[in-house]
């Protein structure tokens, strides 16, 4: 038997646990666990993943490089990596009720925004046209956001983008105006997806509009993929050409993404009867690798496979049903307290609260909430001019539902947020006119007032009483 060639201290370095080899990093992680354990987490795009997913995520699967796809790698030693990726793909299709003759899926893409860019690059040439929901109206940066003076998303620099919007009176997508604009603009891609739109999308209508202008219909279901997998809201797969999703929001997996693409017949030539087949699989796979990425994160794919298995259980359906109930509890309680909700409510996992009638903005309310251990986010609402000081807050149910909270608990959460709104208004009203900017407000609440401390201590104890998988 050969002797270990390096020093014993080197061996201890490679085999020692984090708490022994890097206590500084270990302490920061412990502090973050404590924050999660004792906070009310309402970020709509966050969730608490499961112990089994953590188990898969922290494995030597991360050691392996595997550029390419199963059966066609650029490195050796990938037999088990291939098995894992194929299993993950199989479970992804099963989770959404799909069959491999009609759908394929790429599970290598690293996150949601890159997944969308990879899709666009696969099916569009530079400067071809795309339409997506405007960011202040509930869309996402990766759907091509730009302002009057500046291209914000890289998507808007590579492609020509035109937003569609909601009706300012109803807060609902204006499909009639979308259709008129699409007919004039003739986009190559129509994106149906949101980050702060609380109502269901009419995928059938979107399909009809896409067909009318000869566009691909790309659905970004990042926020709602868990709800779709559980069958508690309608699925886009009947109508979409391509579907993208992150894996860590309502799906409750590791941080990652997937791209689903159609296989088979796309259309039939009405004159010749000739079938026109989809040509999406190879362009999308090539766009992911080698187009935009190198080797995939195999530990993430393993953890995603585990999350997808969990998504195909009765317990996951029970969870998603409770998410919807808790979101409805938020809707009813905010309405009861006199708050205006964008679109007057929700059909999904979150509510978007307008604060304009309260004479306060989302940035200030977010600041106070953070002081009392509530994590939510300021959010643009239709008609806003600034994304930094927007007129609303976005509040999601998935994370705290994972920890076991029910409708009465979410009603209690509304009372805490109502306290934060009133406290923010009180502080803002006391600021002098020449020093009432957001930075002045933050300075004013930076101290430890007795009122804030009492509420924070109450929330710390209450939130900490619910289980958290770590």
UniProtKB/Swiss-Prot annotation:
Main location: cytoplasm
Annotated catalysed reactions: (6R)-5,10-methylene-5,6,7,8-tetrahydrofolate + glycine + H2O = (6S)-5,6,7,8-tetrahydrofolate + L-serine
Top-rank EC class of the record's enzyme: transferase
EC number(s) per entry: 2.1.2.1
Protein's cellular compartments: Cytoplasm
Ranges of compositional bias, category Basic and acidic residues: 12-23
Location of N6-(pyridoxal phosphate)lysine modifications: 249
Associated pathway: One-carbon metabolism; tetrahydrofolate interconversion
Gene Ontology molecular function terms on file: glycine hydroxymethyltransferase activity; pyridoxal phosphate binding
Biased composition (Polar residues): 1-11
Modified-residue entries (N-acetylserine), positions: 2
Leader sequence segment: none
SUPFAM superfamilies: PLP-dependent transferases
BP GO annotations: glycine biosynthetic process from serine; tetrahydrofolate interconversion; tetrahydrofolate metabolic process
Keyword vocabulary terms for this entry: Acetylation, Cytoplasm, One-carbon metabolism, Pyridoxal phosphate, Transferase
NCBIfam families the record matches: PRK00011.1
Extra information: In eukaryotes there are two forms of the enzymes: a cytosolic one and a mitochondrial one.
Functional description taken from the UniProt entry: Interconversion of serine and glycine.
Subunit structure and binding partners: Homotetramer.
Family: Belongs to the SHMT family.
Protein name, per record: Serine hydroxymethyltransferase, cytosolic
Annotated source species: Candida albicans (strain SC5314 / ATCC MYA-2876) (Yeast)
